[in-house]
A protein has these predicted regions:
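ABC family nucleotide-binding domain
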Residues: 1-138, 142
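A short acidic/small-residue loop/turn micro-motif
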Residues: 157-159
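H-loop (His-switch) and adjacent beta-strand-loop-beta switch element
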Residues: 139-155
């Protein structure tokens, strides 16, 4: 059996999390929020952590906001910071729990495109839980679960 420390290290290495509500720490800048998982894992130097945090924020169009705190951003921007934070330790799997549940339609589309890019550009596996039928229709694979039981397993047909 793994120790608590080993389980924590495995989570930090293998999984990134995006929640319905961003759970960014309000007293910290965007840079500091994105740096937190890297600091917890302890794999990179301080300079490498700050460089990676800056690169991730820039990749999501938030580079100029890096010194701001979350309350200075829109809901969609905060959720993009949450996605950047989920990628901080470059995990192979991103778990997204209702990632667009608290967003307007424009921000929902932007966050969905980010999640899609995580798969197509970054080669990540994204496991998303959503009640948004339109969002679910765009996923490569959909598992429809009702009362804890798998009701349907559908795969999107990609034409060559």
């Amino acid at each position: 059996a793994m120790s608590e420390g080993e389980r924590t290290r495995a989570r930090l290495t293998l999984l990134g999390f995006v929640f319905q509500f961003h759970f960014l720490l309000p007293e910290f800048s965007l840079m500091e929020n994105v740096a937190l998982p890297m600091r917890a894992l302890g794999r990179l130097s301080d300079r490498e952590i700050l460089t990676r945090a800056e690169q991730l924020l820039a990749a999501f169009g938030l580079g100029e906001h890096r010194r701001k705190t979350p309350d200075q951003l829109s809901g969609g921007q905060r959720q993009r910071v949450a996605v950047a934070r989920a990628l901080a330790n470059d995990p192979p799997v991103i778990l997204a729990d209702e990632p667009t549940g608290s967003l307007d339609s424009i921000s929902t589309r932007q966050v969905f495109e980010l999640l899609r890019d995580l798969v197509t550009v970054y080669g990540k596996t994204v496991v998303a839980v959503t009640h948004d039928v339109e969002l679910a229709k765009q996923m490569h694979r959909r598992l429809h679960i009702v009362d804890g039981a798998l009701e349907k397993d559908e795969r999107m047909v990609v034409e060559a």
